């Protein structure tokens, strides 16, 4: 928990800010005193969210419909934010799309849809705001939401894995290249955080009744929205001013559990271990 008004005076753009994790992060930013622009393609959802968050937090939130795949639309969204708030301090690239499928069943268009939203959208927003910050000699902070499999890949979500890996490379590359301008670039790699839209696409029936996403997490639970919002708020605040080029995993230990060759032995009962020990002593 950051102190009250830890983000006072800052203006933050959150793509995909109308629902799910984007909304949760926006809520906390507002509670900490920031002004926030939320953007997605669905203006009705954005306006409903903005009205609810104004009432809930008393903060200033601007809803702008924007297709991040289109650079001109991104530039217009940023310009409108400057008109409203006078400055932009933080860009949070959160817009995403995902679904599960054997790769050979995908059309090239299905691949393009995900890569265009996740990778091209993040690049468009980053380039547009970065150009303005550099021209105006203003420091800034970029925070990208990736995923744990951005580093190692994952079967059956190849478009998302490819796009998120690209965003991860973008994060680390610009952390070095733009540091001289006072621009920090970091990322968060969440594990399982249940959201209504993504969850239904990644765990449709019959998978939902057969797979327990929490089962592979050592803490034996999925993440809570506020936990991710806490981390995001820290990374966009001045308290993390020396953090640059980092990808922070927040997954309850799931990634490490899957990486260890013998981690699955956790399922063995004490009796099974007794048998193994007796066998090894022979």
Residue ranges and their predicted role:
Residues 16-20:
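Conserved glycine-rich cofactor-binding loop
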Residues 92, 179, 184, 243-245:
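Short, small/polar-rich loop/turn modules that mediate ligand/substrate recognition or access, typified
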Residues 102-103, 107-115, 213:
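Substrate-binding pocket helix/loop in short-chain dehydrogenase/reductase
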Residues 106, 153-162, 173, 198-201:
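Active-site loop-to-helix junction immediately N-terminal to the catalytic Tyr of the SDR YXXXK motif
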Residues 126, 163, 171:
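Active-site helix of classical SDR
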Residues 131, 135, 176-180, 241:
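Alpha-helical segment proximal to the catalytic Tyr-Lys
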Residues 187, 208-243, 250-252, 277-282:
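C-terminal helical subdomain
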């Amino acid at each position: 928990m950051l102190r009250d008004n830890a983000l006072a005076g800052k203006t933050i753009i959150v793509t995909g800010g109308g629902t799910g994790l984007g909304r949760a992060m926006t809520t906390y930013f507002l509670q900490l005193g920031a002004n926030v622009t939320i953007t997605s393609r669905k203006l009705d959802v954005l306006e409903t969210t903005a009205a609810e968050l104004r009432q809930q937090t008393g903060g200033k939130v601007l809803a702008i419909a924007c297709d991040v795949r289109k650079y001109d639309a991104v530039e217009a969204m940023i310009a409108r934010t400057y008109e409203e708030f006078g400055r932009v301090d933080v860009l949070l690239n959160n817009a995403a799309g995902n679904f599960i499928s054997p790769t050979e069943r995908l059309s090239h268009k299905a691949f393009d849809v995900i890569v265009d939203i996740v990778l091209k959208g993040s690049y468009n927003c980053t380039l547009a705001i970065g150009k303005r910050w550099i021209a105006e000699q203003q420091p800034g902070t970029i925070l990208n939401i990736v995923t744990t499999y951005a580093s190692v890949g994952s079967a059956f979500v190849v478009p998302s894995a490819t796009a998120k890996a690209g965003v991860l490379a973008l994060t680390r590359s610009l952390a070095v290249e733009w540091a001289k301008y006072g621009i920090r670039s970091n990322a968060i790699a969440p594990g399982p955080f249940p959201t209504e839209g993504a969850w239904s696409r990644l765990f449709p029936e019959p998978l939902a009744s057969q797979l327990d996403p929490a089962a592979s997490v050592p803490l034996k639970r999925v993440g809570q929205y506020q936990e991710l919002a806490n981390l995001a708020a820290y990374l966009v605040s001045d308290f993390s001013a020396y953090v640059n080029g980092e990808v922070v995993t927040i997954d309850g230990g799931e990634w490490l559990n899957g990486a260890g060759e013998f981690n699955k032995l956790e399922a063995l009962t004490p009796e099974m271990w007794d048998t193994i020990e007796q066998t090894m002593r022979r």
